[in-house]
Amino acid sequence: MRVARGPHPGANGWLGSWSPRSSDGFHGKGVEVSVGYEDVDRLIRAYADVIADQKDYLTQLDSAIGDADHGINMNRGMQAALAKLDGQAPGDVGALFKAVGMTLVSTVGGAGGPLYGTLFLQLGTATAGKEVIEAADWAAALSAAVAGVQARGKAEPQDKTMVDALIPARDAYEAALGDGATFADALRRSATAAEEGMKATIPLVARKGRASYLGERSAGHQDPGATSSWLLVKTVADTWAGD
């Protein structure tokens, strides 16, 4: 599948130059589709690739309103997570997500480690013991992940954080399923909403984290956490809902 051209250049050019490892991770047709352990494994590997490719861009964003280390830290964490994948026993999707979450907590510095660690740990808790994830399972997992991130970071919409990409992604996904969309189409709509939420952070004044210290000067800059969150939601859609 060819990835749509992204709105921002990264370290190695436009985001559109990256393509996922698989064109279609779905089993089955129509609404009744699911993704399995191997598909989740590919998702994690694909996200690690994206973060590695966009490391410098994420760090550039963070240099404007943060500690200039978001891309570096996220890349360190995802590379460490890759090293854990081969040691996982195939089958339990939740265990795979949890392994990633625990690794991110222990290896990613700053606020990103606890927040992304919580996100993946909540995905793991919601899918614990499952060998496949269906559309409703992912809705529950995404909802749990967003709630976990909010609880950990005490963030609300328009605080200029990763929540500003994740909440629209969750809401769009749930709305799409409610409209009768397929799993794949719901994932695509989720990614589109996450991108819109990410862009909407640009004019916001930060109310959380290091960026909040800048006050009004934080306006006019895209939030790096919202950007890496959009990249995650986009990678889910690109890997599992390939055209």
Model-derived features with residue positions:
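Alpha-helical and His/Cys-centered functional microenvironments
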Residues: 4-6, 12, 31
